């Protein structure tokens, strides 16, 4: 690996005359500027459990069976900006830095995703984004512009800068390469960071990004309102979502050429919802009335408002089994991720209710963009491209939280902005759809799609001790290893093989593997052999 003279000189300057930095609070503190305070530093022998510090309501799950490492937590006060971050510094360092992301409005250090990164021997960092909260709670943002800016981008950038300084000082060596991996809000954080600070990361893996947050959040309330109030004749009860999903499966599964419980081309399916209409012959608990079919029509339609303004794309066919998140669980309200944004990010106040929603909410969100969080500076990605950065973006086709079409739209906006300037998108940005995957991870048991490729949150969604892709630790099956090959060896991924294990334990038998294709290519089965083997598929 090449280390430039300039980088070596920078390290020499940083470490000259200073005593070696060790894993204790005072020693680590000596490597920091005064804005940063080391809260604790604790060396963990191999196979340890890291006990999550009290008060971390966002990420309470303790990772287990860790590699030997120094665990550090840091608090930062930088003018009006306040945030913290956690850092694992492995004994057996791979010379590289990884930052991981957060989810929803979560305020807390994501130690569980950090642990998955530690399994590759990265020095790995997560920021708390500047506040304490669960992922669906936005109250902290009320009339608090500084907390919003920290959440929007400041905490990620500042944490990255400081964690890199600490990493360099601890090892007395430069960082060879820096990576980022996050999903949902984590996907947004990665995109926003490289739009503002193209030098922060050499490679960014962004899953199901909440990039268009100032439209996504209002849409969350809008789409929820289609199915409310729950006493209305047009309300579709949660119990009917699997019924709708089964009918979509019946009509759309074969549209990709193979009937295999995986819908991989939902837009090629000419779905006829009238097959669900209640008639005297129907099973009354497995059909929809005309007003309910009207609601279904709304759910499958883009949100377009005044003057034909496109606000947000619709949920895709095949996402029905995750609809309980946005379309009514047991409450009579849209999801908090929409309502809290309007109440506390747009400062309409706690009295605001979803019945008050109108296009003015979208206009205000457009004008204010709370926290400067929306990752829509497509043009800025040319700076990331120019300095050699690589971006890998993916989205599950069965996502019921962030409409899959918002990622397709992101791809087209980046294309429309950069292609006219002569930028070859494939040279630095590649997008992959994941048939049958829900939001960031998982697949319904009636679908059983290959969904695991070591994307952000995936290891943590099945276990407290998994890292990477067990049994398939290579760049063909592991998106982070694929990114490393792209950045370090110039080997760009054309497909990623996703894996589905029996029972999702990552230890049972492999049930299915299948390549995910680089957009706009689609999966095509060869027509010969076992559809559950990746080798019988290609991307065309
Ligand atoms: C790791 O710790 C667990 C208990 O937490 C123990 O059962 C196991 O034997 C240990 N493994 C190794 C390799 O030390
Ligand atoms: C978050 O919680 C921690 C632990 O309880 C506390 O020390 C810290 O002050 C809190 N931060 C904010 C911004 O409220
Ligand atoms: C501190 O704040 C300054 C001014 O806003 C900003 O430029 C800098 O990136 C911040 N640094 C960190 C480490 O947060
Ligand atoms: C009617 O539909 C419900 C819900 O899908 C199902 O549980 C039940 O078995 C069906 N009844 C008959 C008689 O098919
Ligand atoms: C819609 O278009 C009309 C005519 O161009 C314009 O006067 C009006 O302000 C627009 N409304 C909104 C909400 O943008
Ligand atoms: C409607 O919402 C109310 C309030 O949350 C709840 O108590 C009730 O069970 C819901 N009814 C249905 C049919 O879901
Ligand atoms: C918001 O981001 C833009 C770049 O996208 C930048 O020009 C502007 O200064 C930022 N505003 C704040 C308040 O951080
Ligand atoms: C999967 O789980 C089921 C029960 O949840 C169990 O009966 C079955 O043996 C498991 N399969 C494997 C391969 O472990």
Where are these regions (language model features)?
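Fungal secretory targeting signals
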Residues: 1-22
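Short, solvent-exposed loop/turn and secondary-structure capping segments
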Residues: 83-86, 109-114, 135-139, 190-196, ...
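Alpha/beta-hydrolase fold nucleophile elbow
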Residues: 173-184
């Amino acid at each position: 690996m090449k280390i430039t003279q300039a980088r070596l000189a920078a390290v020499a300057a940083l470490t000259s005359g200073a005593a070696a930095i060790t894993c204790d609070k005072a020693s680590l503190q000596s490597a920091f500027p005064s804005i940063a305070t080391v809260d604790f530093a604790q060396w963990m022998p191999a196979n340890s459990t890291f006990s999550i510090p009290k008060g971390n309501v966002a990420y309470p799950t303790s990772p287990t069976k860790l590699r030997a490492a120094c665990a550090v937590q840091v608090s930062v006060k930088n003018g009006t900006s306040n945030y913290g971050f956690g850092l694992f510094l492995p004994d057996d360092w791979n010379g590289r830095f990884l930052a991981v992301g957060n989810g929803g409005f979560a305020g807390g250090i994501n130690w569980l995703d950090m642990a998955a990164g530690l399994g590759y021997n990265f020095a790995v960092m997560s920021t708390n984004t500047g506040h304490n909260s669960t992922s669906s709670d936005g109250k902290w943002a009320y009339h608090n512009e500084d907390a919003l800016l920290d959440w929007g981008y400041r905490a990620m950038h500042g944490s990255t800068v400081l964690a890199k300084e600490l990493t360099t000082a601890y090892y007395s060596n430069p960082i060879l390469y820096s990576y980022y991996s996050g999903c949902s809000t984590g996907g947004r954080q990665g995109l926003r960071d490289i739009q503002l600070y193209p030098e922060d990361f050499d490679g960014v893996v962004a899953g199901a990004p909440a990039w268009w947050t100032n439209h996504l959040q209002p849409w969350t309330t809008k789409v929820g309102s289609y199915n409310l109030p729950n006493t209305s004749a047009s309300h579709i009860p949660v119990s009917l979502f699997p019924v709708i999903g089964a009918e979509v499966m019946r009509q759309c599964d074969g549209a990709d050429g193979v009937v295999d419980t995986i819908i991989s081309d939902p837009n090629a399916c000419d779905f006829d919802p009238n097959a669900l209409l209640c008639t005297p012959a129907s099973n009354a608990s497995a059909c929809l009335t005309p007003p309910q079919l009207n609601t279904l029509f709304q759910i499958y339609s883009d949100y377009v408002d005044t003057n034909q303004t496109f606000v947000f794309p619709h949920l895709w066919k095949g996402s029905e089994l995750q609809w309980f998140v946005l379309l009514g669980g047991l409450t009579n309200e849209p999801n908090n991720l929409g309502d809290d944004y309007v109440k506390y990010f747009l400062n309409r106040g706690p009295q605001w209710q979803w019945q008050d929603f109108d296009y003015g909410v979208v206009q205000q969100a457009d004008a204010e963009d709370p926290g400067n969080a929306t990752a829509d500076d497509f043009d800025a990605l040319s700076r990331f491209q120019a300095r050699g950065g690589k971006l890998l973006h993916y989205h599950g086709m069965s996502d019921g939280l962030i409409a899959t079409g918002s990622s397709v739209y992101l791809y087209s906006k980046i294309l429309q902005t950069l292609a006219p300037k002569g930028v070859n998108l494939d040279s630095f940005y590649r997008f992959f759809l994941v048939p049958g995957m829900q939001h960031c991870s998982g697949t319904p048991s009636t679908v059983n799609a290959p969904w695991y490729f070591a994307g952000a949150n995936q290891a943590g969604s099945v276990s407290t001790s998994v890292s990477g892709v067990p049994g398939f630790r290579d760049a063909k099956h592991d998106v982070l290893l694929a990114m490393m090959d792209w950045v370090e060896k110039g080997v760009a991924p054309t497909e990623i093989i996703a894996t589905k294990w029996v029972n999702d334990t990552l230890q049972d038998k492999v049930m299915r593997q299948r390549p995910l294709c680089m957009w706009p290519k689609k999966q095509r089965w060869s027509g010969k052999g076992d559809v559950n083997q990746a080798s019988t598929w290609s991307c065309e």
